[in-house]
Amino acid sequence: MTLDNNQELTYRNSQSLGQPGFSLAVNSSNPFNHSGLNFGQNNDSKKISVENNRIGEIVPGRVANIKVIGVGGGGGNAVNRMIESDVSGVEFWSINTDAQALTLAGAPSRLQIGQKLTRGLGAGGNPAIGQKAAEESRDEIATALEGADLVFITAGMGGGTGTGAAPIVAEVAKEMGALTVGVVTRPFVFEGRRRTSQAEQGIEGLKSRVDTLIIIPNNKLLEVIPEQTPVQEAFRYADDVLRQGVQGISDIITIPGLVNVDFADVRAVMADAGSALMGIGVSSGKSRAREAAIAAISSPLLECSIEGARGVVFNITGGSDLTLHEVNAAAETIYEVVDPNANIIFGAVIDDRLQGEVRITVIATGFTGEIQAAPQQNAANARVVSAPPKRTPTQTPLTNSPAPTPEPKEKSGLDIPDFLQRRRPPKN
């Protein structure tokens, strides 16, 4: 059963393959009739027909069709958060086995899966039920994904529907030719060992069915949220990080900015890329762009360092005061860390709500071999965008030196992580 408040919008792209208003009639007897030149029978005048001359006319191209699919309770919550945050240029879907949860979903398009199996009562925390429900509704899922160029699948791993159904949704999306990106969370430790074990199984199943998989470790959020944060608020933080992962990629495709990126650029980096890491940083002040970049690549959300990444998509967003020099400073900071031959795609977007601040989202792919543990964030004015400002004790791996204390505020310059300092030899 498909609950779609905008049914006609769902199939619009699949039914409009041509460009309306730009018809082209071809006369088989004269192959030059549609070339823009008039080779008529008038021997007195060999003029170019102005009426038929289409040189210089721009034919509008088709905008990339982006769909965000929230699977299960966690995925649905993330979609709700995206809608509340006015994420634009994408089509939202909520997919669930729980009919009651779907009625409360904010997505305009909703799909209940596994009606015969679950009778709308959910998967009971059992991923096997979630998988069977998705298999039962495979055709309906394909209809929902029809016409998509880029599909984001967001879910909270560890439960029943999200863990079991998300890999099937991804499989269908890939079969239909869409660039498929999974953005999922790994559960908090306090959610229990069973849920953690189920999450790992779901992640493995999803990893082989998507082009790129971004995993957000919820437990890492404990390093950046206050100790007094209620449980419900902690889960809202996790939902918002999922939102930022999707928006960081979709914005650079859908929103015209200082530096425009098209869908083909993003596909070049993310197609068949495997596991990916995501970092987010925000900063203000004189060196805000560089500090935000360092915060992003040193983010507590990173389970390991992005050093050596061979594919990077990053988005720098700022107010109307964002300068090209700041964009360059952020880009150079990231260039210093990744593989010298990395394929790097970045966009710069203006958001007037960020006056005085710069926000950077980094998605890194293409890792080989062992990846070292990520260093902690140390930029003095930088922070993770999803959390209020809070400094936590810095843990420096592979060293016996005592934990560093915060630098005095008067000190000039930037406290740069060790791995960045090692990667900054004199330029040739």
Curated annotation (Swiss-Prot):
Gene3D superfamilies: Tubulin/FtsZ, C-terminal domain, Tubulin/FtsZ, GTPase domain. Keywords: Cell cycle, Cell division, Cytoplasm, GTP-binding, Nucleotide-binding, Septation. One of its GO terms (cellular component) is cell division site. It is found in: Cytoplasm. GTP binds at G73, G74, G75, G76, N77, G160, T161, G162, E191, R195, D239. Essential cell division protein that forms a contractile ring structure (Z ring) at the future cell division site. The regulation of the ring assembly controls the timing and the location of cell division. One of the functions of the FtsZ ring is to recruit other cell division proteins to the septum to produce a new cell wall between the dividing cells. Binds GTP and shows GTPase activity. This is Cell division protein FtsZ. It comes from Nostoc sp. (strain PCC 7120 / SAG 25.82 / UTEX 2576).
